[in-house]
Amino acid sequence: MSKTSVIIEPYGIGHAVALLRDNLLADLLIDPKKETDQLTIGSIVAAKVDRFVKGANGTFVSLPNKRQGFIRGFQHSSDINNIIIVSVSTHTESHKAQVVSTKFVIKSRFTIATFSKPGINFSRKIRDRSVKDRINTEISQTTKDIPDNIGIIIRSSAESAEEGEVINDLKKQIEILEMLNCEGLTEPKVLLRSPLARELVLRDLPTLDFKNIIEEKSAFDRFGLWEQIYQLADTRVNLVNGGFLLIEATAAFISVDINTGKDVSKSAALNTNLLAVRELARQLLIRGLGGKIIIEFAPLLKIDRRKIEYELTRSFRNDRIQTSIVGWTKLGN
């Protein structure tokens, strides 16, 4: 059983938060050093609809920070010049239009507000009928204040909530929903900024496997985390057998090159490839990389591809972001 810890220390406008598994960095969130007009993932804004581009199958909108946003698949030409509510859905390079979406959820510690499924619904992890009945009774007087087009999902963390915690959480959600109103607006406006690192982690704390939380000044120095973080600036990741992988982010995709190093033995390629794919999921997560990923494996027999596919699937299985393995190219990667 791996030991899991959360390390938190003050940093910038908020905190730096690291998830450690067996003393290795497994996830990382760091707040900006200073306030900026950058819209981070999860920010909800009122945007002005500019134009629909048929060839791009989407619509461009104006955002509050003077950048353009892009909504994939949004084709309502009648909304041109209207103000609509969107959420920043992914990190986008500064020279590209920021990808936003009209479909989003608002998470809190015990509930999730959604615009796609009205009514009160429970997480599938809550199987105890008595728990559902207790929560339904507790929130029954508050549900009448929920807008008709809004659904509330009771998270699995509510199962162990103290009396009154779920209803207080729900009341805060309703207050937030009331803020998300673009009626009367004629210009883009930030309606709700995404939570900072510490708030984000503590919000999801009950649903994640955290064993220890350490929050103190200079905690990152005490656990040698800054050294691990500085290593992320290097594209090279060394493996225990002397091999290494090179991870480089381009504008189009993430390139991963696996090398055996000085080992030229018969089993070197397969062993290095297996070690590399086991490490890759962690490296992509702590580097904040995603999207299309192309892996150039060390020379590999076709008969061994099944082993690589299995290890890739296993390595990414616990990632909160679903990863699809598309297959092998004719070039062998």
Residue ranges and their predicted role:
Residues M1-L39, S43-V49, N81-A252, R320-N333:
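OB-fold/S1-family RNA-binding modules
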Residues R21, P32, L63-R67, Q75, ...:
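A short beta-strand motif that forms part of the nucleic acid-binding face
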Residues L28-E35, F60, K66-S78, F122-I126, ...:
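Beta-strand/loop nucleic-acid-binding surfaces
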Residues G55, R67-I71, Q75-S78, I85-S94:
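Long, basic N-terminal domains or extensions that often function
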Residues R67-Q68, P118-I120, E159-S160, T260-D263, ...:
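A short, flexible beta-alpha/helix-coil linker loop
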Residues H76-D79, L285-R287:
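SF2 DExD/H RNA helicase N-terminal ATP-binding lobe
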